[in-house]
């Protein structure tokens, strides 16, 4: 016990000990039971004390559901080496509570055992074998783990110095946690629970009906409480603020990020789930689930793969085992990629960003440079439809819903999340994809009906449209960047315009990478990596700040990249650009935006076709069918997403007109 803690408490008086004994309380050594001044012994009943015990005041009552009130105190419990904060209620502990500090106004009822057994780091330092089930890409789990740090540890194994130094930084944090004494934060609620061993519990946590918790941290905070529910079993785990683990979920060697939900018997081992993941019913093994990885279905297995912004259809499955050297294979589905019902992928494979996988695929394609594609199966053959997802209203709906569904309320956010559908990361892939498709057509000939790429087949019509869709998206992104850059600029002379277009930073040139949610220039990421390797970064806090700064300055860096690509793609020197050239870019941007929006509008209209009404108006004629459909689904023109598309066309057209108006005097 610290000196400060001794000063706060005093020994029991003989009179207080007498009253406690009258209430069927006992102690191995009453001299080791200390209390705060103002202590009243009447609210302690049938309790045994051993080791050192420190008791706060019992002055408040707890109002429980059903109109029940319970006064704070100790009832039918056993405490060993425990400090109890003010106004706690601890009752009906079937076995004992040992080696814990319990925060004020916590409620603990009907539990079996809560103990710390020897020195522990409370789930920090657990090696999580992600991606490769047999090991080799272990991520060191700890309380403050971000998706980006985990990405370094799992993906950058070709830089052993980085891995070594990053682990060194993290172990510095972990070793500071090492203790033989645990904490239960203030206002925690723990009821009807089995065994809790070596678990650190944050303030305002709710643990109700949980079966067993072993070696972990529940990092609840007031602004973002953690909730654990009935029949949950967790071993070697960390659960971050704002997350909910419910109804029979079983976790082993897992990190759960902020604002995640796992429920309905979900089972996971050796997996990482970062911000806003939602997992129900299914199973995960050795997955790197970046932000917004979602699965709801009992028949879905996610294994040995990396995801983010992903939705898994029912029956989605993958294999990391070819029955030769064991489960050693892995896969990557880049941000926004998703699977349809009953899809299957035999790893290794790499699926491009914002692509959709349908059917069974066993030929190990690498399609990272063909984003926004459909990967479908026909007659046991993989067919690729490049770029088609750019005109899918579902893609736009996804992009709009992710920011709205960010449920993080903790002011300290672990993950830096970029929601942009079009970014230097995806546009550089489209530029590569356009080159690939153009070269395929040149080499195989324009008269070919089928083209082959990475063990996938591409129909001639799909290839032609894919080039067109990529060009539309490139025009849209580069035009958006240009218009945004000139927003609010008084176009008094072409020199003023040229000056406004000049990048304010040299950061942003070259390739960009997606660090599981954080989109950043590769050169800057490598600079951070080199600083870690050279021990220029002295602690985890400094590393996290560097990553946050990358995210904060995204748009400045984006413009540096866009500035280069505008010159390269259009063959324009922006230091000598004319008003006419800018106007041409704006017109091209506007026509591309409108064409894509019209494609989205047409795609949305399919959801209101006659075939979509099948099953409506079951006992009526076509008039009843249409009326029933409209009552349930609404009118096409009043649909939220349809209206947003039309509004987008109007807004972008007006934005283009406004800039053209400012440029008019210079033309």
Where are these regions (language model features)?
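Glycine-rich hexapeptide-repeat left-handed beta-helix
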Residues: 2-8, 14, 19-27, 35-58, ...
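Long, charge-dense tracts
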Residues: 95-96, 100-102, 106-107, 112-122, ...
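Long, structured ligand/cofactor-binding scaffold of large enzymes
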Residues: 76, 85, 176, 193
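Long, compositionally biased intrinsically disordered regions
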Residues: 111, 378-667
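Glycine-rich adenosyl-nucleotide cofactor-binding module
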Residues: 165-185
């Amino acid at each position: 016990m610290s000196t400060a803690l001794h000063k706060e408490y005093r020994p029991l008086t003989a009179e207080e000990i007498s009253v406690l004994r009258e209430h069927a309380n006992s102690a191995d050594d009453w001299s080791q039971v200390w209390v705060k001044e103002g202590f009243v012994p009447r609210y302690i009943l049938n309790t045994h004390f051993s080791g050192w015990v420190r008791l706060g005041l019992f002055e408040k009552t707890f109002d429980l559901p059903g109109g029940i009130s319970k006064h704070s105190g100790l009832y039918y419990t056993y405490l060993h080496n425990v400090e109890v904060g003010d106004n706690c209620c601890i009752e009906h502990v079937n076995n004992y509570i040992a080696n814990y500090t319990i925060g004020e106004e916590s409620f603990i009822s009907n539990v079996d055992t809560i103990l710390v057994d020897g020195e522990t780091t409370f789930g920090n330092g657990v090696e999580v074998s992600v991606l490769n089930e047999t090991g080799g890409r272990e991520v060191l789990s700890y309380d403050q783990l971000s998706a980006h740090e985990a990405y370094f540890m799992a993906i950058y194994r070709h830089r052993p110095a980085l891995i070594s130094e990053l682990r060194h930084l993290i172990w510095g944090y972990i070793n500071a946690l090492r203790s033989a004494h645990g904490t239960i934060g203030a206002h925690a609620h723990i009821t009807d629970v089995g065994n809790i061993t070596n678990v650190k519990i944050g303030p305002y946590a709710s643990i109700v009906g949980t079966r067993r918790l072993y070696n972990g941290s529940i990092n609840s905070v007031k602004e973002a409480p953690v909730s654990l529910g009935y029949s949950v079993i967790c071993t070697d785990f960390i659960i971050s603020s704002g997350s909910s683990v419910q109804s029979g979920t079983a976790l082993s060697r897992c990190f759960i990020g902020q604002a995640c939900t796992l429920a309905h018997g979900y089972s996971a081992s050796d997996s990482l789930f970062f911000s806003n993941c939602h997992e129900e019913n299914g199973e995960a093994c050795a997955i790197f689930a970046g932000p917004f990885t979602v699965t709801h279905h009992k028949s879905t297995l996610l294994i040995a793969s990396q995801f983010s912004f992903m939705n898994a259809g029912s029956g989605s499955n993958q294999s990391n085992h070819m029955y030769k050297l064991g489960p050693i294979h892995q896969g990557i589905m880049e941000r926004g990629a998703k699977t349809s019902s009953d899809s299957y992928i035999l790893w290794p494979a790499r699926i491009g960003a914002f692509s959709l996988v349908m059917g069974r695929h066993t030929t190990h394609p690498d399609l990272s440079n063909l984003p926004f594609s459909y990967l479908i199966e026909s007659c046991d053959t993989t067919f690729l439809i490049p770029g088609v997802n750019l005109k899918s209203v579902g893609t736009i709906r996804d992009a709009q819903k992710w920011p709205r569904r960010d449920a993080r309320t903790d002011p300290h956010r672990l993950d830096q999340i970029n929601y942009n559908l079009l970014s230097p990361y995806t546009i550089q892939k489209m530029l590569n994809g356009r080159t690939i498709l153009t070269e395929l057509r040149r080499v195989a000939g324009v008269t070919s009906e089928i083209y082959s790429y990475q063990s996938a087949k591409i129909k001639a019509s799909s290839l032609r449209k894919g080039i067109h869709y990529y060009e539309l998206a490139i025009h849209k992104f580069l035009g958006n960047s240009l218009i945004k850059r000139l927003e609010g600029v008084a176009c008094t002379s072409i020199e003023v315009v040229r000056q406004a277009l000049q990048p304010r930073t040299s950061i942003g040139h070259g390739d960009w990478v997606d660090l599981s949610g954080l989109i950043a220039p590769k050169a800057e990421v490598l600079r951070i990596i080199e600083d870690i390797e050279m021990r220029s970064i002295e602690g985890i806090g400094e590393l996290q700040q560097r990553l946050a700064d990358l995210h904060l300055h995204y748009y400045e860096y984006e413009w540096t990249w866009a500035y280069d690509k505008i010159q390269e793609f259009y063959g324009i020197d922006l230091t000598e650009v004319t008003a006419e050239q800018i106007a041409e870019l704006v017109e091209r941007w506007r026509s591309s935006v409108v064409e894509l929006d019209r494609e989205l509008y047409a795609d949305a209209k399919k959801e209101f076709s006659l075939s979509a009404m099948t099953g409506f108006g079951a006992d009526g004629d076509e008039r009843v069918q249409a009326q029933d459909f409209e009552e349930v689904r609404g009118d096409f023109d009043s649909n939220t997403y349809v209206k947003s598309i039309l509004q987008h066309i109007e807004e972008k057209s007006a934005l283009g007109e406004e800039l053209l108006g400012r440029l008019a005097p210079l033309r």
